[in-house]
C-alpha cells in the first residue's frame, strides 16, 4: 500500500506543477 500512497502524492505534485505552468504561460496545446 505504500507504493499506492507514493504514486498518489507524485501524481498530485505533477498536477500542481502542470497547473502552475498552464496558468503562468498561455495555453499552447489545443485550439
UniProtKB/Swiss-Prot annotation:
Sequence intervals crossing the membrane: 3-23
Q: Give the domain of life.
A: Bacteria
Coarse class of the primary localization is: membrane
> Sorted alphabetically, which keywords does the UniProt record give?
Membrane, Photosynthesis, Photosystem II, Thylakoid, Transmembrane, Transmembrane helix
Q: Does the keyword Lipoprotein apply?
A: no
Q: Pfam families annotated for this entry? A: PsbT
Q: Does the keyword Protease apply?
A: no
Q: Which GO terms describe its biological process?
A: photosynthesis
Compartments, record wording = Cellular thylakoid membrane
What cellular component GO annotations does this protein have?
photosystem II reaction center; plasma membrane-derived thylakoid membrane
Give the bilayer topology: Single-pass membrane protein
- Assembly, per entry: PSII is composed of 1 copy each of membrane proteins PsbA, PsbB, PsbC, PsbD, PsbE, PsbF, PsbH, PsbI, PsbJ, PsbK, PsbL, PsbM, PsbT, PsbX, PsbY, PsbZ, Psb30/Ycf12, peripheral proteins PsbO, CyanoQ (PsbQ), PsbU, PsbV and a large number of cofactors. It forms dimeric complexes.
Q: Which family does it belong to?
A: Belongs to the PsbT family.
Function of this protein? Found at the monomer-monomer interface of the photosystem II (PS II) dimer, plays a role in assembly and dimerization of PSII. PSII is a light-driven water plastoquinone oxidoreductase, using light energy to abstract electrons from H(2)O, generating a proton gradient subsequently used for ATP formation.
Name the chain's protein: Photosystem II reaction center protein T
Q: Which organism is it from?
A: Trichodesmium erythraeum (strain IMS101)
Q: What is the lineage of its organism?
A: Bacteria, Bacillati, Cyanobacteriota, Cyanophyceae, Oscillatoriophycideae
